């Protein structure tokens, strides 16, 4: 396949029209880049959108945890404490909500970044850029890209900035994985 030069602004503007977010047209990069394969173009979009999202802050959510603790945190699970005999060790079983970055959207982004970095036809510099993004997803557990339910990822006004990123991720996963 031959290399083709693509004006990134054109791709950015087409995405802005496709997602009805015309306010993003002004953010379009003014450079051109060479892409040998479609994976290269998608990797560039994912790198720029993920970097943008990391700067804004990753989406966080609450996950319920149950642990034996020496101090009270959240609600005391009296039945669990009796069952595990925590009182003998001077501990209590507590149920509490933990504010974590391990959300469905972050799992989808992490899975896509890993998929592109490992299996995509991506230029070495973009592969390195993808690898540099992974430490930001250290607290996010890995999932199988085929198991991602794209329709179940709910966007609201708080996480609406994920819209472009998730669309690029879905395109990448559906294009890279055999059906």
Language-model segments: residues:
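Terminal, charged accessory segments of proteins
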Residues: 1-178
């Amino acid at each position: 396949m031959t290399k083709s030069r693509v004006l990134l602004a054109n791709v950015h503007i087409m995405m802005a029209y496709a997602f009805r977010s015309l306010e993003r047209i002004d953010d379009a990069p003014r450079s051109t880049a060479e892409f040998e394969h479609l994976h290269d173009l998608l990797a560039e979009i994912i790198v720029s959108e993920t970097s943008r999202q990391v700067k804004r802050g990753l989406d966080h959510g609450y996950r319920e945890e149950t642990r034996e603790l020496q101090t009270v945190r959240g609600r005391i699970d009296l039945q669990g404490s009796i069952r595990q005999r925590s009182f003998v060790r001077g501990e209590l079983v507590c149920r509490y909500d933990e504010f974590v970055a391990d959300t469905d959207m972050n799992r989808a982004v992490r899975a896509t970044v890993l998929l592109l970095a490992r299996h995509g036809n991506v230029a070495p510099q973009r592969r390195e850029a993808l690898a540099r993004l992974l430490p930001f997803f250290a607290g996010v557990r890995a999932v199988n890209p085929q198991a991602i339910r794209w329709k179940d990822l709910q966007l609201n006004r708080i996480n609406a900035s994920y819209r472009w990123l998730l669309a690029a991720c879905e395109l990448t996963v559906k294009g890279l994985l055999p059906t």
